[in-house]
Structures are given as C-alpha cells and as structure tokens.
Amino acid sequence: MLRGSASSTSMEKAKGKEWTSTEKSREEDQQASNQPNSIALPGTSAKRTKEKMSIKGSKVLCPKKKAEHTDNPRPQKKIPIPPLPSKLPPVNLIHRDILRAWCQQLKLSSKGQKLDAYKRLCAFAYPNQKDFPSTAKEAKIRKSLQKKLKVEKGETSLQSSETHPPEVALPPVGEPPALENSTALLEGVNTVVVTTSAPEALLASWARISARARTPEAVESPQEASGVRWCVVHGKSLPADTDGWVHLQFHAGQAWVPEKQEGRVSALFLLPASNFPPPHLEDNMLCPKCVHRNKVLIKSLQWE
C-alpha cells in the first residue's frame, strides 16, 4: 500500500512539473510575441520625437534666415559729393550724406542732428554767413515760406500777363485796310489787329458776340449811317447795302444764326475772327456770304 501511494504521489509531482513547464513555455511565447510590439512602440515614439525636433529646428532656423536677409539689405545708390560751395545753401536743400562728407573733409564732427552739423560747418567754413535756421522747426517754417513765395510769384506773373494790355498793331498811315467792292464808302474806317493766341482770340470773340447780342436792336447803330457793317467771321468791315445781313443771337453758350422764317435759328459753325472792330461798328453781325457758308456746312454735317 505504501508503495502504491508513493508511486501515485510521484506521478502527480511529474504531472505538476509538466504543467508548470507548459505554462512557463506559454508565458514565454506570449512574452516573445508581445516583445516586438513593446519594442516598436519606443521606436515610433522616437521617430515622432525626432520629427518634432526637426520641425522645431526648422522653425528656429527660419527666423535666422530672415534675420540674415534683413541684416543684408540692398545696397543703396551712392550720392555724388560735390565740392564745397562759395556760399552754403540752406539746410533743407543739403542731403545728410553730403553734409556729413563735407564735415569729414574739414575734419569736423558729423555726429548728432543734421542741423547741429550744419551749424558746425557754418561756424568753421562760413563765419560771415549768419542767415541759417537755429532749430529744425525754423527750417521747416522757412521751407514752407519759400514755397508760398514761389506760388505767390507765379500767381502775380499770371495776373500781370492777364491784366497787361495786348499788343496792338495799327495799320500804317496812308494805307487804308483792304475792303471788298467799295473803297469810297469805307474811307476813314480803321481796323485794330490784336496779336493773341488762337484759343484766347476765340474766347474773346465769343465774349464780344455774347455781349453785343444782348443789346437791344431797335436803336439804329452808327454803322448803318456810315454804310458799312462788321462781319464777325471775316473780321473786317463790308458794305451794308447788300441784303442778307443778320444779327447773331446768343443762347445757352452758343451763337445762333436767325433764318428767314421767323422763330427759326441755326447754330453758327464758322469760327469768328480774332480782329477787334472799331468802336462805332457793331460786333454781332454776319454777312450774307457767311450766312450761306454756314448753311452749306450744316447740310454737309447732317446725316443722310
């Protein structure tokens, strides 16, 4: 009985050892199967950390590159340095680099503000010149005053040119003006020729026409008594005995030619002359030839 019990216990021990060995082998297999995952995880994390470090490094390097670009700006053009003048110009007309170069030529300090260097240069090289601003504000004020003076000079020159009377060329004595058809009737009539530019002459002519067109026509003008009339387009006096003379009308900034039918007018397309009539002749009349020319011009401009 003892032997049987001993053999059974030994068999149980052997089975227990085998079971424990199989469990250990299973655990080892599981550990071996799990080990690559555990190894891969640190690898991936290491890669991620490396990528993060590289991104950070690139971010750090970018400002450095930008700083390098900003530290090396484009080379500026060198300003030519003129020699020292006999009289120093105002401080607002001198460039800072030129002033600095002049100070360096005379071995003067060019530090500080531009006005300080200008004062040092004046005191050293131009002791007799005292008309210079003492502050930057005074320099700005002087600059603005100079601009105002230039503008005022330009305005005064324009006003003088406008108010100055135009040059008048009178015909030579003994030579009457060229007249058509009748010379006996037009003796003693003087024509005044004004030398002006074409646009000014046209404006002056239109101004005269508009001023005369507003005057009443009932009063008999002296030109009818003298037997001559002044044609606006021809710019000279012509015989008044021919039929077809018309008084120009001026409405809405346009000169109009009255037609034979009452109440109808046509626009004046002919340009007036730049000659001024004598004082006793009316300046808003159109001769029959010019009336006909204006009608032909209107017909040619009409659409077919």
Swiss-Prot record:
InterPro entries: Dppa2/4, Dppa2/4_C_dom, Dppa2/4_central_dom. GO terms for biological process: lung-associated mesenchyme development; system development. The modification Phosphoserine is found at residues 221, 226. One of its GO terms (molecular function) is chromatin binding. Residues 12-29 have a biased composition (Basic and acidic residues). The keyword Transcription applies. Interacts with DPPA2. Interacts with PCGF1. May be involved in the maintenance of active epigenetic status of target genes. May inhibit differentiation of embryonic cells into a primitive ectoderm lineage. This is Developmental pluripotency-associated protein 4. It comes from Homo sapiens (Human). The lineage of its organism: Eukaryota, Metazoa, Chordata, Craniata, Vertebrata.
